[in-house]
């Protein structure tokens, strides 16, 4: 395991038990609407099989299960602590695996989703290539990820929240300050907008789009497998 993967595993493993409540409180509950929007987009594609990578406690995978009751929805994560919580919430197909090295054959899924997980992977481009590998031709990718707001004032306020407030609030909720300090740094460093779309094109996808939500605090990216 690489140093980055070990660091991420340690951080998220330590906050697994309070991961859901912390996310909902720190986002003031808006994270529900973000996942709902993502789930509606995927539903409109009418997939028969979906792999939700970095599924965590399964929120997006569970939303897809409700909207696509006849589809096979695999929730993939490399943390057994997270998958156990996802199973307790009703995830039907948990898969313990690393998103960088998926245990699926080429073209296994109509769609791959990943919510708030891509920036945590050591090599974003390689991860996109692995996602492309397991998606069927003309299948779809959806990425839901944090980004920086588009307006100057909102961006400044958001950065203050990310770097000054969030680590303290996250620590009080989970007892783990480093995970939430890392969150702000990883959002700053992650490619967004056109840069993210270009990376998708360079790693097996066509027709990329992006849709900022909540002033650009998060962005939904979609693309089609070549």
Language-model segment annotations:
Residues 28-48:
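Conserved alpha-helix/loop element of class I SAM-dependent methyltransferases that forms part
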Residues 100-111:
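A short acidic, Gly/Pro-enriched loop at the edge of an enzyme's catalytic core
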Residues 125-140:
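A short glycine-rich, Lys/Arg-flanked "PGG" loop and its adjoining helix->strand segment in the class I
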């Amino acid at each position: 395991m690489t140093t980055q993967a070990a660091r991420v595993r340690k951080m998220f493993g330590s906050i697994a038990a309070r991961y859901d409540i912390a996310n909902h409180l720190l986002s003031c509950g808006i994270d529900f609407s973000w996942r709902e929007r993502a789930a509606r987009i995927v539903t409109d594609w009418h997939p028969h099989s979906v792999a939700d990578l970095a599924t965590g406690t399964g929120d997006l995978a569970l939303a897809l299960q409700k909207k696509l009751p006849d589809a096979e929805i695999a929730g993939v994560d490399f943390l057994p602590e997270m998958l156990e919580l996802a199973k307790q919430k009703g995830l039907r197909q948990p898969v313990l695996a690393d998103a960088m090295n998926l245990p699926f054959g080429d073209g296994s899924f109509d769609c791959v989703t990943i919510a708030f997980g891509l920036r945590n992977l050591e090599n974003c481009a390689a991860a996109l290539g692995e996602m492309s590998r397991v998606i069927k031709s003309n299948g779809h990718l959806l990425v839901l990820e944090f980004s920086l707001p588009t307006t100057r004032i909102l961006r400044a306020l958001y950065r203050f929240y990310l770097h000054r407030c969030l680590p303290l609030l996250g620590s009080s909720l989970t007892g783990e300050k480093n995970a939430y300090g890392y969150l702000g740094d990883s959002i700053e460093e992650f490619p967004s907008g056109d840069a993210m779309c270009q990376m998708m094109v360079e790693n097996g996808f066509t027709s990329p789009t992006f849709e900022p939500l909540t002033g650009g605090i998060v962005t939904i990216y979609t693309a089609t497998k070549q």
